[in-house]
Amino acid sequence: ANLATESELVKLDISPDLVSLILSNRPFLSIHDFNKVLANYDKEELFKKIFVPLNLNTTNEKDFKMIPGVGDRMAHEFEEYRPYKSIQQFKREIGKYVDEIEVSRYLSYIFVPVELNTSSEENIKALPGVGNKMAHEFVEYRPYMNLNQFRREIGKYVDDKELIRLERFVYLK
């Protein structure tokens, strides 16, 4: 919300009033400041359009509560099962507390980072916005010696903005 241009916000199909509100209240020093500005809006729909997925292994409990419908108890449970090795583990553990529909809804807001050289193609496909073709490309260029190699190889298929987004989801041992 701090970096998006007016035209980028409009492309998200949000109301002109909300676009103006966001622009006039920037910069947001934290997600909590942004959340306060959105108090009178349908945050669930908006967050699906603009939310940056949270890393299940590093996000603090307070930030998990920014996910629509996540309260104290569920935020605690998100932290309780760390470290997560896969989205499947998250589904299994959190599925003890909520139904499958709710677990699936949470997947719009979170991710488990993947190790580039060892993660299964299934775990790579669980990353936000990564489909079969991109997951295949991640695997095809193994072994990765460093993140520069990842940037060079995957950068053949996506623009710089998407490459930066994808890099948030991966690491090397």
For each of these PLM feature ranges, what is it?
Residues 1-4, 54-64, 114-124:
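Disulfide-bonded cysteine-rich modules in secreted/extracellular proteins
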Residues 6, 19, 43, 61, ...:
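Short functional linear motifs
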Residues 9, 19-23, 33-35, 64-67, ...:
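Short alpha-helical segments in extracytoplasmic peptidoglycan/chitin-binding modules
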Residues 15-16, 71, 131:
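Small-residue hinge/turn detector
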Residues 18, 29-32, 41-42, 74, ...:
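Short loop/beta submotifs within extracellular cysteine-rich repeat domains
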Residues 25-27, 81-83, 141-143:
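Residue-level signature of tetratricopeptide-repeat
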Residues 36-57, 88, 92-117, 154-173:
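Alpha-helical interaction/regulatory segments in DNA maintenance proteins
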Residues 125-128, 132-152, 157-173:
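Long, low-complexity acidic/proline-rich regions
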